[in-house]
Amino acid sequence: MKGLRFERIGTNRYYNVVFHMGSSYVPVSDDTVEELKAQSLLPVERFLELLVDRVGYSSYLKHQIRTELKSSGDPVTQITVLQGAIREL
């Protein structure tokens, strides 16, 4: 599946949420999920920077997120959808 998306994979696990970047994914801590939820009403550009900083904890992941964002259509729409999705996790 192309694009960026969050997925809840369970509860009471070490990682309950994963962030998909195309065919790859990275686990996301509950603390990071809560921080992103709290900041989900930021303007798109600022939320993107926060997302890349918190989820992309290595330069490789940061590059993967930005590359997938560029290749999957309108970046503003993708980030807006992610902002809504994170509030529902």
Segments (PLM) and residue ranges:
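Short intrinsically disordered terminal tails
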Residues: 1-2, 87-89
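Acidic, low-complexity, intrinsically disordered interaction modules
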Residues: 14-76
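Amphipathic, interaction-prone secondary-structure segments
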Residues: 2-19
